[in-house]
């Protein structure tokens, strides 16, 4: 039984395939599972059509088709997402339904970079996918060595354009279809080569417990003689009794507080950590001075902001979204973590309106400050129904 225990101790990394339609993302996903199974005896081989018929999931009220497969290398355990359609990628990346620690950009060597190749790189930059490795696919169809080099250069240029280190990014040339047919052969070697690159290029993600403490406030009440309690689920980090933390959001400046107790299931703890549903007892604040929508966080780790750039997906009518476009100056509610805040939208130069089903970069200004940082997800709502999803791309003020 020693083996199973060892498997669990491998670092876990989330990755996904991105790239233009028909460049071979799903074929590569299938080829990876079969090659890994063939070479390492780990994971199950998953057939192409199983991945292609991805089940629908709902994330923040949005239906997304996503296929999930798992496999292992010598060093790591990987969870891999693949989406059947371009729209599914856009929704997936913006809602963070499948958070990626890194991505495999699949580009057909026979076609070179195409519009969605570029769009997926841009989306990766906007939503904070930190690392990309390139798999030039269908190399069996290209006899001309110079053509391969040309495509590789084009992809590297694209990566540089969107602030990824294009010159240093690993680029592996292979054929997913050939690896699928013969995982033990030379094309299978290319899949192994791809994962040697991924194992080294995509670093191990920082565990949630190692990040700075943050807990969105869900509810507040006072305990006579003991003080004010804020309840919620700790999103990341660790909070200890007697520690000084900050209350952030809905006011201009964060307010410093001291934790006098942490409770979980009516038991007192020395500390709470990521994933725990806790009540945090606070000294020096009245019940009416803290509210849902604020966060408790490690002092200095997050600031309140009102203005930022965001990447937004607008729901289609069929998804329960708006039936009509919206224009510059549109004022919906923005739902962050636990609360709605009104704000207004500024569209990019030359964009007149946004149609249901579009994805777009926009500037958002909120009427009250919210604890915000790059990568924070939010929903856009009108009268309580979700009409869009977004992610903070960069802070303005």
Swiss-Prot record:
It holds the Pfam family GTP_EFTU_D2. Monomer. The keyword Protein biosynthesis applies. GTP hydrolase that promotes the GTP-dependent binding of aminoacyl-tRNA to the A-site of ribosomes during protein biosynthesis. One of its GO terms (cellular component) is cytosol. It is an enzyme of class 3 (hydrolase). Residues 61-65 are annotated as: G2. Keywords: Cytoplasm, Elongation factor, GTP-binding, Hydrolase, Magnesium, Metal-binding, Nucleotide-binding, Protein biosynthesis. Its EC number is 3.6.5.3. GTP binds at residues 19-26, 82-86, 137-140. InterPro entries: EF-Tu_GTP-bd, EF-Tu_GTPase, EFTu-like_2, EFTU_2, G_TR_CS, P-loop_NTPase, Small_GTP-bd, T_Tr_GTP-bd_dom. Signal peptide: none annotated. Residues 19-26 are annotated as: G1. Residues 137-140 are annotated as: G4. Residues 10-206 form the tr-type G domain. It comes from Alkaliphilus metalliredigens (strain QYMF). Transmembrane segments: none annotated. This is Elongation factor Tu 2. Residues 175-177 are annotated as: G5. It catalyses: GTP + H2O = GDP + phosphate + H(+). Gene3D superfamilies: P-loop containing nucleotide triphosphate hydrolases, Translation factors. Mg(2+) binds at residue 26. It is found in: Cytoplasm. GO terms for molecular function: GTP binding; GTPase activity; translation elongation factor activity. Belongs to the TRAFAC class translation factor GTPase superfamily. Classic translation factor GTPase family. EF-Tu/EF-1A subfamily.
């Amino acid at each position: 039984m020693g083996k199973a225990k060892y498997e669990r101790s491998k670092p876990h990394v989330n990755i996904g395939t991105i790239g233009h339609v028909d460049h071979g993302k799903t074929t590569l996903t299938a080829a990876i599972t079969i090659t890994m199974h063939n070479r390492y005896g780990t994971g199950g081989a998953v057939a192409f059509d199983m991945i292609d018929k991805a089940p629908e999931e709902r994330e923040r009220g949005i239906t997304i088709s996503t296929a999930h497969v798992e496999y292992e290398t010598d060093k790591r355990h990987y969870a891999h997402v693949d989406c059947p359609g371009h729209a599914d990628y856009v929704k997936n990346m913006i809602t963070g339904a499948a958070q990626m620690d890194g991505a495999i950009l699949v580009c057909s060597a026979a076609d070179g970079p195409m519009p969605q190749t570029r769009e997926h790189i841009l989306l990766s930059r906007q939503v904070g996918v930190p690392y990309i490795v390139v798999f030039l696919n269908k190399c069996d169809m290209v006899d001309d060595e110079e053509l391969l080099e040309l495509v590789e250069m084009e992809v590297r240029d694209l990566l540089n354009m969107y602030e990824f280190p294009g010159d240093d990014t690993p680029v592996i040339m292979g054929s997913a279809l050939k690896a699928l047919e013969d995982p033990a052969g030379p094309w299978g070697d290319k899949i192994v080569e791809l994962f040697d690159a991924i194992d080294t290029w995509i670093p191990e993600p920082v565990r949630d417990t190692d990040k700075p403490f943050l807990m969105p406030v869900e509810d507040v009440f006072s305990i006579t003689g003991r003080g004010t309690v804020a309840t919620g689920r700790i999103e990341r980090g660790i909070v200890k009794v007697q520690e000084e933390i900050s209350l952030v959001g809905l006011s201009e400046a964060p307010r410093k507080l001291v934790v006098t107790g942490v409770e979980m299931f009516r038991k007192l703890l020395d500390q709470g950590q990521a994933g725990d549903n806790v009540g945090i007892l606070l000294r020096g604040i009245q019940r009416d001075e803290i509210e849902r929508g604020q966060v408790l966080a490690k002092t200095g780790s997050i600031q309140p902001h009102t203005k930022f750039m965001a990447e937004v997906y607008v729901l289609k009518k069929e998804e329960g979204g708006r039936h009509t476009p919206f224009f510059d100056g549109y004022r919906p509610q923005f739902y962050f973590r636990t609360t709605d805040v009104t704000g207004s939208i500024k569209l990019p130069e030359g964009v007149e309106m946004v149609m249901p089903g579009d994805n777009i970069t926009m500037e958002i200004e909120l009427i009250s400050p919210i604890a915000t940082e790059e990568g924070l997800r939010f929903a856009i709502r009108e009268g309580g129904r979700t009409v869009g999803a977004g992610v903070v791309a960069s802070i303005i003020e």
